[in-house]
């Protein structure tokens, strides 16, 4: 069973997302024919899927691999340099090069960024192997590496030629990674009321990992993101900002833990709960709404407990570095109802007072 949808960004060429019930790498062959191919993956995914992927490629392809360490802390300048050095040392040229990101969000982000800057832009393909990367980071063209002062601070908007994935990847995906991915899925439920109702009615099948339901879940999640990206590919109008619901708080959590604590999806889950509580604090939603929204998050196995090892001063400093901020104004994605999110400016004092009473 295959589900296919198209992404039509504001400025970039359209491309397909292919969601497969089985794992068939032959779907990307048309995109690598007569190309120099660099497969970028990590140590974990390489052990599981690299041999199978290489076997699917035709014999006359010029193929190299670049295997990085596994973890958010390796979404770094050092890892980027390793990719670029591999390209240069093997004489990859602009018109014949295609990079293949075989892995989760970290691999997709750093490979996409390498593709964006190598010789001013070469082709790349996304093969996301985690639920989170399938529904979020592989779609929409955001590519980046982290800096010691903030997450995703060095990057570019750069779209892939195609996204191919399969729910068969879940067979080797740790449960913690699966639940972390569900946080991004649940985020889309707060953006779309129809999807909220669909998730609510299909919760048991999702938690049981029913194949047909999971394909539909991934497809619907990608459709929501694709619709937003079509309106505001490069965050010029503010429409795309709603995709960052939970991320202002979540990124600050990751930064405070030096990217070695909560996984990105886990931090987003906590971040959504924080954004919901902040919305209640500001009078945008009732106490009952806040409870219902947080209960919905938890019902998918997602923890919303704020890490106890983070001090408020450090957390506030991390939030001040958020990319959405401008002219010293703090910007948050807040919620007024299911399907009603908005980008709002708040003062530093308002945030400090909220943090004081919420700890």
Swiss-Prot record:
Location(s), subcellular: Cytoplasm
Top-level EC class as recorded in UniProt: lyase
SUPFAM superfamilies registered for this protein in UniProt: Dehydroquinate synthase-like
Protein keywords: Amino-acid biosynthesis, Aromatic amino acid biosynthesis, Cobalt, Cytoplasm, Lyase, Metal-binding, NAD, Nucleotide-binding, Zinc
Gene Ontology CC terms: cytoplasm
Cofactor binding comment, as recorded: Binds 1 divalent metal cation per subunit. Can use either Co(2+) or Zn(2+).
Reactions performed catalytically: 7-phospho-2-dehydro-3-deoxy-D-arabino-heptonate = 3-dehydroquinate + phosphate
Pathway involvement of the protein, from the record: Metabolic intermediate biosynthesis; chorismate biosynthesis; chorismate from D-erythrose 4-phosphate and phosphoenolpyruvate: step 2/7
Record function comment: Catalyzes the conversion of 3-deoxy-D-arabino-heptulosonate 7-phosphate (DAHP) to dehydroquinate (DHQ).
UniProt source species: Francisella tularensis subsp. novicida (strain U112)
Identification of the protein by name: 3-dehydroquinate synthase
Pfam family, one: DHQS_C
Family per similarity comment: Belongs to the sugar phosphate cyclases superfamily. Dehydroquinate synthase family.
GO MF term list: 3-dehydroquinate synthase activity; metal ion binding; nucleotide binding
Protein transport is among the record's keywords: no
Entry's EC annotation: 4.2.3.4
Record-listed NAD(+) binding positions: 70-75, 105-109, 129-130, 142, 151, 169-172
Positions bound to Zn(2+): 184, 247, 264
């Amino acid at each position: 069973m295959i589900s296919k949808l198209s992404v039509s960004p504001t400025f970039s060429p359209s491309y397909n997302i292919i969601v497969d019930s089985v794992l068939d790498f032959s779907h990307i062959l048309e995109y690598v024919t007569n190309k120099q191919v660099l497969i970028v993956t990590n140590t974990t995914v390489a052990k599981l899927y690299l041999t199978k992927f290489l076997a699917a490629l035709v014999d006359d392809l010029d193929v190299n691999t670049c295997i990085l360490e596994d973890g958010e802390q390796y979404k770094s300048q050092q890892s980027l340099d390793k990719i670029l050095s591999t390209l240069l040392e093997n004489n990859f040229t602009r018109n014949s090069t295609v990079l293949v990101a075989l892995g989760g969000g970290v691999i997709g982000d750093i490979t996409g960024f390498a593709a964006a800057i190598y010789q001013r832009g070469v082709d790349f393909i996304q093969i996301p192997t985690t639920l989170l990367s399938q529904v979020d980071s592989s779609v929409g063209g955001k590519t980046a590496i982290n800096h010691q002062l903030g997450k995703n601070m060095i990057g570019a908007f750069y779209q892939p030629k195609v996204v191919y994935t399969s729910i068969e990847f879940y067979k080797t995906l740790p449960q913690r990674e699966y639940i972390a991915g569900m946080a991004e899925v649940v985020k889309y439920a707060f953006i779309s009321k129809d999807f909220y109702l669909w998730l609510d009615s299909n919760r048991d099948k999702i938690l049981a990992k029913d194949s047909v339901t999971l394909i539909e879940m991934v497809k619907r999640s990608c459709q929501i993101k694709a619709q937003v990206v079509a309106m505001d590919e490069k965050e010029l109008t503010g429409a795309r900002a709603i995709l960052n619901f939970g991320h202002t708080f979540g990124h600050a959590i990751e930064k405070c833990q030096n990217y070695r604590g909560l996984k990105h999806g886990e931090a987003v889950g906590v971040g959504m709960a924080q954004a919901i509580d902040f919305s209640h604090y500001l009078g945008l939603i009732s106490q009952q709404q806040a409870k219902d929204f947080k209960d919905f998050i938890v019902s998918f196995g997602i923890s919303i407990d704020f890490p106890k090892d983070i001090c408020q001063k450090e957390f506030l400093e991390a939030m001040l570095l958020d990319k959405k901020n401008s002219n010293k104004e703090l910007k948050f994605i807040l919620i007024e109802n299911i399907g009603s999110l908005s980008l709002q400016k708040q003062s530093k004092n308002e945030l400090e007072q909220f943090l004081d009473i919420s700890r």
